[in-house]
Every structure is written in C-alpha cells, then in structure tokens.
C-alpha cells in the first residue's frame, strides 16, 4: 500500500481552530454514550448539543456547525428525528457525519443507514465490520464489536466513499481515512480505548467537529482519528485501568497541541 499518505500538515492545525472558534455540534446519538460524547467534545474545545426531539431537530441542525447521526440505540422515533435533522443539514449546507453502529448485525439499523447514504453524508466513521456491511459486503461483527481487521475493510471503504461522496474512516489498530482516491493511514492507539464505552462514538463526534472547520473533510476526519489515538496512548501511560483511563483521556484530548500531533505523525 505504497499510496498511503501521512497526516496532512494542514490537518494538524484544526484542533487549534476548534478551540479558537468552537463549532456547535448537534449530536443525535445513543443514550449509552451521550454524556461521554459531550465531554469529549468539550475537552476538544467544541460545543456539544444533544437535541433529539423530532420537533426541534430540523431547526437545530440549521443553526449547528455540524451534525452527528449515531444509531447505537436506534428507535423509530429517533430515526424520524434523524431524518429531519439530516434533511435540514443538507438544506443549510451543514456537514454531517454518520456513525453506523452495529450495521450488518441488525436489520432495522442497516436498512436505515443505507437509506441515509442517499443524503450525502460528509463523513462516515465505523469499525471494519460496520464499513464492510454498509458497503454491502460480508463482515464478521458481533453487535458493536468487529472481528475484521481494518486493512480488510479498506477496499470497501474506498468503494463506499466513491459511491456516496463521503470521506470514510475505518478505525482499528490502524485507521484508514479515504475519500475514494486519497488514503491516510494512522497506526497507534491503545487497547484501553476498547475497554471504555463510547470512545468510538465520541470519535465520530470529533470527526463532525473537525470537518466543520475545513473544506477538506479528509483532513478533518484524519486529525480527529489522530487526536483520539494519541490521547489514548498518553492516557494509558497514566491510567491504572479503564476507569481512570476515561478521565485521563479527556485530560489528554484537552492538552494535545498541533506540535504533539506533528511529532507523533511527522509529514
């Protein structure tokens, strides 16, 4: 895979832009991770809003800087609110990110997420099994967990990006972020990231926040992945286990600088 690209220098500046000009991120996310997602966005300098009522979703999506759709605890009522928010985001030109949690494992959410693909998501962030399933390919998933390696899903991610116009981030031991042509690869992270509920979902929220700050969604999605990986590595050095890791992860997200990212992933 000689065509893999490093983290772009322009992307490294985006976390500082988020802190200087906090984007308002409208999160239609699942009830398990809502608080942690909000805290991750706050740590990164963004402004989270967890507006989920169908009656408010459209109005809020129009005023937001970015919209996140996460189907982790999807219900028919929530799906209706998501449809309204996505339609309003498209009308307003607001970037929106799809997190297809457990797609492929359950029929209702799989059908719903495939429906949303026609609404031109700016970015899609998922694990290998989710990306494979969303692309219509066989995957080995167990609920929200993936038994596939991210390398296996890269070709599917590229095809999904080509078909939808979205940037696709397939995350694992190595994260691959692609717009169908360009591919950025980021190795790293720490196993403790899989021991705390909500790290993947909050990463998708970071993708939404970062893509709101740039005309190049590939750079936005890539720096979000880099931020979570490096914060995870640093938090693990200080943590005694999953509980303290979650706290340190927030601290490290808040503390990371462009220089830290450039040192970890030199161009």
From Swiss-Prot:
Its cofactor is Mg(2+). One of its GO terms (molecular function) is hydroxyethylthiazole kinase activity. Keywords: ATP-binding, Kinase, Magnesium, Metal-binding, Nucleotide-binding, Thiamine biosynthesis, Transferase. Transmembrane segments: none annotated. One of its GO terms (biological process) is thiamine diphosphate biosynthetic process. It catalyses: 5-(2-hydroxyethyl)-4-methylthiazole + ATP = 4-methyl-5-(2-phosphooxyethyl)-thiazole + ADP + H(+). Substrate binds at residues 50, 198. It comes from the Bacteria. It is an enzyme of class 2 (transferase). Pathway: Cofactor biosynthesis; thiamine diphosphate biosynthesis; 4-methyl-5-(2-phosphoethyl)-thiazole from 5-(2-hydroxyethyl)-4-methylthiazole: step 1/1. Its EC number is 2.7.1.50. ATP binds at residues 125, 171. Belongs to the Thz kinase family. Catalyzes the phosphorylation of the hydroxyl group of 4-methyl-5-beta-hydroxyethylthiazole (THZ). NCBIfam families: PRK09355.1, thiM. This is Hydroxyethylthiazole kinase. It comes from Laribacter hongkongensis (strain HLHK9). The gene is thiM.
